[in-house]
Design a protein with these regions (language model features):
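Hydrophobic alpha-helical segments and helix-packing faces
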Residues: 26, 82, 232, 260-268
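Hydrophobic beta-strand-centered segment that forms part of the acyl-chain substrate-binding groove
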Residues: 49-61, 69, 73-130, 267-310
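Aromatic/pi-system hotspot detector in well-structured domains
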Residues: 86, 106, 149, 224-229, ...
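A beta-strand-loop signature enriched in Asp, Gly, Thr, and Trp
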Residues: 256-261, 286-288
């Protein structure tokens, strides 16, 4: 008997993987995550500011709407960094993809509510579609699995509901599964939650009053901010362990073909940190339009980025901004093209 995740030819459409521990978002978890990804979002760092903006009490919020979650411990009114939330959800989903070779896409990653410190995340992963790849001479056979990842909090309120497409090897090198699903349909109809509903009751004017610059309206679509200084990628296996990510390529150099690969969310977390350096008025992230990993990242690489303003929509004392982060390795290649929707005040 071997304790391991499934290979592609052991998956079936509709198969569910609910047996993964829930994760409570604690101060310690957030602090370690910050030490690796460099969280600079003021709302997830400053409890007093979070109380001003969201109206949640530091002693534990009681909201039941779609926005901020309900906490139970000290500081529970402070929203968790969004990168911590999606890192945990993705990590919990790797119970289905321990043998993953690559992730081809993420779709529909839009927040349904913003968890706070003290909330617990529980994730179920289901196989939404399967397609075996065409054989390629000299390469082991692989297939693509479209996974629907549903994360709720301790009160069963939706937090995230998105799709991830993983490339997995077959256990039987001569296996023919016949799987030929149209994976373009996976998550294609996913709609973002209403940003106005997510931010219901938030006082963005209180955030803006703290003088973070540039504020909403001071940058316009087409503006590009180059972020001075890079960030070294460090503690990659520790981030994977922290978020329950058991994909072998992030832990085992043999599984990765000789050099461990950095978890894609690690690169995204550093990109978000650099975006917050460029735009200190960045309040939070509502969701992703697209996320393309263009080249492999390894521990010890240094990453630089630019942030482009692609769209802007006013929301009273602040607004929604469509941002595009382009991340490059110091060695030359672009490694990430990430387009996301954020709140700026």
């Amino acid at each position: 008997m071997k304790a391991e995740g499934p290979y592609f030819d052991e998956l079936t459409a509709g198969q569910a993987f609910p047996t993964v521990p829930g994760v409570t978002l604690t101060e310690g978890l957030a602090a370690v995550h910050q030490s690796i990804t460099g969280d600079r979002l003021a709302l997830s760092l400053d409890t007093a500011l979070a109380e001003e903006v969201t109206g949640a009490s530091a002693g534990g919020g009681t909201g039941t709407g779609p926005g901020v979650g309900t906490g139970t411990g000290p500081g529970a009114g402070r929203p968790a960094n969004p990168a911590l939330v999606w890192d945990v959800a993705i990590g919990q989903s790797t119970v289905a993809t321990q043998h993953v070779k690559a992730n081809l896409f993420y779709r529909g990653l839009w927040f349904r509510r913003f968890p706070v410190i003290g909330d617990t995340l529980r994730t179920t992963t289901r196989v939404d579609g399967l397609r075996q790849n065409r054989p390629r001479e000299g390469r082991a056979p692989t297939g693509l699995a479209a996974l629907r990842i549903t994360t709720v909090d301790q009160h069963e309120r939706p937090v995230l509901d998105f799709w991830r497409c993983a490339m997995l090897p077959l256990r039987d090198p001569s296996g023919q599964t016949g799987h030929a699903d149209d994976l373009d349909a996976a998550g294609a109809s996913a709609k973002p939650a209403s940003p106005a509903a997510l931010l219901d009751g938030w006082r963005l004017d209180r955030f803006a009053a703290h003088g973070f610059w540039p504020q909403y309206g001071e940058l316009v679509p087409g503006d590009v901010v180059e972020v001075a200084g890079g960030d070294v990628v460090s503690n990659a296996p520790e981030l994977a362990r922290l978020t329950l990510n058991i994909a072998a390529v992030h832990h085992d150099e043999q599984a990765a073909g000789g050099t461990r690969l950095v978890y894609g969310g690690h690169t995204i977390g550093l990109a978000l940190s650099q975006a917050a350096r460029a735009l200190p008025g960045l309040v939070t992230v509502v969701g992703w339009f697209s996320c393309d990993h263009l080249a492999a990242v390894h521990e010890g690489d240094t990453l630089h980025s630019s942030v482009e303003i692609e769209s802007a929509e006013a929301l009273g004392a602040g607004g929604l901004v469509g941002l595009r982060s382009r991340v490059y390795s110091a060695s030359g290649p672009q490694v990430l093209d990430w387009r996301f929707l954020a709140v700026l005040a």
